[in-house]
Regions:
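N-terminal helix-turn-helix DNA-binding module of bacterial transcription factors
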Residues: 1-3
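Mid-protein regulatory/catalytic core that forms ligand/cofactor-binding pockets
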Residues: 9-151
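Acidic, metal-coordinating catalytic segment for phosphate/diphosphate chemistry
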Residues: 154-160
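Acidic, proline/serine/threonine- and glycine-rich low-complexity intrinsically disordered segments
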Residues: 162-164
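Conserved small/polar residues in nucleotide/adenosyl-binding loops
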Residues: 166-170
Length: 170
C-alpha cells in the first residue's frame, strides 16, 4: 500500500514542545566532509563540506532526544554554535530565507548505547525510537540528513496520513 503523510509546516522539536522550556546541550558542532553514504543522501560530493551537529534536546530539563545531523554548508550559510540552542528550522526559515517542504522518514526501534544512555538519562540497552530523516527545501534540494534517537517513554509521534487511491494496492 502507498500512504503519504502530510504536515502543514515543518514541525521540529521546539514546535512540538511549545509551552515547555526547550533547551539543548551541544556535544559537537563541526564542519566535515560527510561519509559517502550521507553525502549521497544530501546530493553533494564526498569532498563538499557539511555541518555536523550532535545535540540533546530537552523539554522542561528532561532529555528527550539525541540528534546526529548533517547539513550542506553551501545551503545553510552562517550557522553558528549559538544557533544550535534554539530551533534549527526557524534559523533556516528566518535567517536563510529558505522554505522547508518535506521530510522522508524511516522509523525503527533501537537500543541505547552506553554514551546515549548517559546523555539521555536512561539505562544502556533501553529502547529508543530512531527517526532517520532527509529534509527537503521547496527547491527539491536536501538540506538535512539526521538520525534522532528518542527516549521511548518520553516521545510521541503524531502523524496525519492520507491514502492515495491511485497508488493503493490491496
Amino acid at each position: 500500500a502507498f500512504f503519504q503523510g502530510k504536515n502543514d509546516r515543518a514541525q521540529g522539536f521546539s514546535y512540538e514542545h511549545r509551552g515547555e522550556k526547550v533547551t539543548s546541550v551541544v556535544y559537537d558542532f563541526s564542519i566535515v566532509n560527510p561519509p559517502a553514504d550521507i553525502a549521497a543522501q544530501l546530493g553533494i560530493a564526498e569532498d563538499d563540506f557539511a555541518y555536523h551537529v550532535v545535540r540533546v534536546r530537552q523539554a522542561d530539563e528532561k532529555p528527550i532526544v539525541i540528534e546526529y545531523t548533517y547539513m550542506p554548508l553551501e545551503l545553510i550559510p552562517g550557522l553558528k554554535k549559538k544557533d544550535l540552542y534554539g530551533s534549527l528550522y526557524r534559523f533556516i526559515r528566518e535567517q536563510c530565507g529558505l522554505k522547508i517542504s518535506s521530510f522522508h522518514r524511516t522509523i525503527r526501534a533501537v537500543a541505547a548505547t552506553e554514551e546515549e544512555a548517559e546523555r539521555l538519562d536512561t539505562k544502556p540497552g533501553s529502547p529508543l525510537l530512531e527517526l532517520t530523516q532527509i529534509g527537503f527545501l521547496d527547491s527539491g534540494a536536501a538540506f538535512e540528513y539526521s538520525v534522532s534517537r528518542n527516549v521511548g517513554d518520553r516521545f510521541e509521534l503524531h502523524n496525519v496520513t492520507s491514502v492515495s487511491y491511485t497508488h493503493l494496492t490491496l
